[in-house]
Amino acid sequence: MANVVVVGAQWGDEGKGKIVDWLSERADVIARFQGGHNAGHTLVIDGTVYKLHALPSGVVRGGKLSVIGNGVVLDPWHLVAEIETVRAQGVEITPETLMIAENTPLILPIHGELDRAREEAASKGTKIGTTGRGIGPAYEDKVGRRSVRVADLADDATLEARVDRALQHHDPLRRGLGIEAVDRDGLIAQLKEIAPAILTYAAPVWKVLNEKRKAGHRILFEGAQGALLDIDFGTYPFVTSSNVIAGQAATGVGIGPGAIDYVLGIVKAYTTRVGEGPFPTELDDADGQRLGERGHEFGTTTGRKRRCGWFDAALVRQTCATSGVNGIALTKLDVLDGFETLKICVGYDLDGKVLDYLPTAADQQGRCAPIYEEMDGWSESTEGARSWADLPGNAVKYVRRIEELIQCPVALLSTSPERDDTILVTDPFAD
C-alpha cells in the first residue's frame, strides 16, 4: 500500500485541507508532522464548514486514525477547545481515533506572550508577521532542550522540573522586554489541570505507525503551511520555525523515509502570501484585488488579508525539487475565470542577470524582478468541473504550461472548495 505526503508548495493557504480530506477517504491513518495551530484548514463537507488548526483533517472522517506527531508543537488548551468545537458539529473523537505522540512539545502561555512581545518591539522591516500564537518560541525551547512535552504531564516532579528549566530562560527574556516574571505555581497548576485531557490521547506514535505500515495500512502525512515558509529553504527570516518540506514527514512522526511512496505538492493557480517577506509576483493593482476577492483570500487563523500575485513557476519548480514532489494538486483554477490575460513568472531579473530560481540572500530576493510569460485567459466558468472535457481550451493550455515550467505533472485539479469538484489524473495512492 502506498503512503502519501501532502505538502504546500508555495507560502501556505494552497487548499491542502480539501485535498487531504479528499485523499483521507482512502487512507487508514492521517498524520500531522509539523507546525502548530498557526496554520488553518477549512473543510466543506455536505455543506458543513469545519475550521481546523491543531487537529489533523482526517478527524472529520469516521473510522480513521488521526495522529499528531512529535514534529508538531501543541497548545493543549487550544486542542481541547478545538475538540469540543468539532464534537459539537457531530464529529466523534476518542483515543481510538486520535493519538498524540508522547514526545510532542507543548506550547505554553509564556510562548504566546513572548511571541507577541517580540513582534510589538520589532521595528518596521524586522517584523516577521507571526500569528502571535507562540509557535516560534515553542520550537526554540524544543531545540534548547527545555520543552515541556506531553509525556512530562504524567509525573508531577518531572513536570515541575521541566517548567523550572524553561523559566530559567524565559524570565530574563521577559525582563528585557518589560514583561513581568512568570507565575510559576500558576503555570504548573494550569498544566496539571489540562494534563488528563491530553494524556487520554498520548501514545508511542512512532511504534503505532510502524506497526500500521507493516500491516499494509495506508498512511497520509499532512503538512501545514508551505515549503516557501520552511526554516531552511524558505524566504528566511520571514519563515515559520519548523521544516515544512516533505523530508520532515519521516522525522515528524518517527517513521523511516522509506515509508514515503509519493509526495503530492499543493499549488494554487496563482500566488498568495500572509505576513511579511519578499513576494516577486505580488500585485498591488486591480488584478491583485480581484484575485483576493474572488479567492476569498483571508487567513483561516488570523483573518488577515492575504497578499496576491501571479503564478510563480520558478518558485514552485524550486519547491518541487526540495520536497521531491512526484505530482501536484492544482487548486483554485476557477478564481482565474474571466481574466483576459494571465501572467506566469518564469524567472527573475537580478541586476541585469537572469535567474531561474530565487536566490538565498535576502537582499538579492528583494531585488528580483519577475520575468513574465503572458497567456490568453478564458471567459467560461471552470467552477465545479470534474473532467478535462468540462474545461475551456485556454484553461487546459494554462495547466499544461504550468506542468512544463515546473517540470512536474498535475495529479489532481481542484475547481471549487467542494471535495467532489476534483479532476483525478494520477492516483497518489496507486501502488
Swiss-Prot record:
<dbReference type="InterPro" id="IPR027417">
    <property type="entry name" value="P-loop_NTPase"/>
</dbReference>
<comment type="function">
    <text>Plays an important role in the de novo pathway of purine nucleotide biosynthesis. Catalyzes the first committed step in the biosynthesis of AMP from IMP.</text>
</comment>
<feature type="binding site">
    <location>
        <position position="306"/>
    </location>
    <ligand>
        <name>GTP</name>
    </ligand>
</feature>
<dbReference type="GO" id="GO:0046040">
    <property type="term" value="P:IMP metabolic process"/>
</dbReference>
<dbReference type="GO" id="GO:0000287">
    <property type="term" value="F:magnesium ion binding"/>
</dbReference>
<dbReference type="InterPro" id="IPR042109">
    <property type="entry name" value="Adenylosuccinate_synth_dom1"/>
</dbReference>
<dbReference type="InterPro" id="IPR042111">
    <property type="entry name" value="Adenylosuccinate_synth_dom3"/>
</dbReference>
<comment type="similarity">
    <text>Belongs to the adenylosuccinate synthetase family.</text>
</comment>
<dbReference type="GO" id="GO:0044208">
    <property type="term" value="P:'de novo' AMP biosynthetic process"/>
</dbReference>
<keyword id="KW-0436">Ligase</keyword>
<dbReference type="GO" id="GO:0005737">
    <property type="term" value="C:cytoplasm"/>
</dbReference>
<keyword id="KW-0547">Nucleotide-binding</keyword>
<dbReference type="GO" id="GO:0004019">
    <property type="term" value="F:adenylosuccinate synthase activity"/>
</dbReference>
<comment type="pathway">
    <text>Purine metabolism; AMP biosynthesis via de novo pathway; AMP from IMP: step 1/2.</text>
</comment>
<feature type="binding site">
    <location>
        <begin position="332"/>
        <end position="334"/>
    </location>
    <ligand>
        <name>GTP</name>
    </ligand>
</feature>
<feature type="active site" description="Proton acceptor">
    <location>
        <position position="13"/>
    </location>
</feature>
<feature type="binding site" description="in other chain">
    <location>
        <position position="240"/>
    </location>
    <ligand>
        <name>IMP</name>
    </ligand>
</feature>
<dbReference type="InterPro" id="IPR033128">
    <property type="entry name" value="Adenylosuccin_syn_Lys_AS"/>
</dbReference>
<feature type="binding site">
    <location>
        <position position="13"/>
    </location>
    <ligand>
        <name>Mg(2+)</name>
    </ligand>
</feature>
<feature type="binding site">
    <location>
        <begin position="300"/>
        <end position="306"/>
    </location>
    <ligand>
        <name>substrate</name>
    </ligand>
</feature>
<feature type="binding site">
    <location>
        <begin position="40"/>
        <end position="42"/>
    </location>
    <ligand>
        <name>GTP</name>
    </ligand>
</feature>
<keyword id="KW-0460">Magnesium</keyword>
<dbReference type="InterPro" id="IPR018220">
    <property type="entry name" value="Adenylosuccin_syn_GTP-bd"/>
</dbReference>
<keyword id="KW-0342">GTP-binding</keyword>
<feature type="binding site" description="in other chain">
    <location>
        <position position="131"/>
    </location>
    <ligand>
        <name>IMP</name>
    </ligand>
</feature>
<feature type="binding site" description="in other chain">
    <location>
        <position position="304"/>
    </location>
    <ligand>
        <name>IMP</name>
    </ligand>
</feature>
<dbReference type="InterPro" id="IPR001114">
    <property type="entry name" value="Adenylosuccinate_synthetase"/>
</dbReference>
<feature type="binding site">
    <location>
        <position position="40"/>
    </location>
    <ligand>
        <name>Mg(2+)</name>
    </ligand>
</feature>
<keyword id="KW-0963">Cytoplasm</keyword>
<protein>
    <recommendedName>
        <fullName>Adenylosuccinate synthetase</fullName>
        <ecNumber>6.3.4.4</ecNumber>
    </recommendedName>
</protein>
<feature type="binding site" description="in other chain">
    <location>
        <position position="225"/>
    </location>
    <ligand>
        <name>IMP</name>
    </ligand>
</feature>
<keyword id="KW-0479">Metal-binding</keyword>
<feature type="binding site">
    <location>
        <begin position="414"/>
        <end position="416"/>
    </location>
    <ligand>
        <name>GTP</name>
    </ligand>
</feature>
<keyword id="KW-0658">Purine biosynthesis</keyword>
<dbReference type="GO" id="GO:0005525">
    <property type="term" value="F:GTP binding"/>
</dbReference>
<feature type="binding site">
    <location>
        <position position="145"/>
    </location>
    <ligand>
        <name>IMP</name>
    </ligand>
</feature>
<feature type="binding site" description="in other chain">
    <location>
        <begin position="38"/>
        <end position="41"/>
    </location>
    <ligand>
        <name>IMP</name>
    </ligand>
</feature>
<feature type="binding site" description="in other chain">
    <location>
        <begin position="13"/>
        <end position="16"/>
    </location>
    <ligand>
        <name>IMP</name>
    </ligand>
</feature>
<comment type="subunit">
    <text>Homodimer.</text>
</comment>
<feature type="binding site">
    <location>
        <begin position="12"/>
        <end position="18"/>
    </location>
    <ligand>
        <name>GTP</name>
    </ligand>
</feature>
<dbReference type="InterPro" id="IPR042110">
    <property type="entry name" value="Adenylosuccinate_synth_dom2"/>
</dbReference>
<feature type="active site" description="Proton donor">
    <location>
        <position position="41"/>
    </location>
</feature>
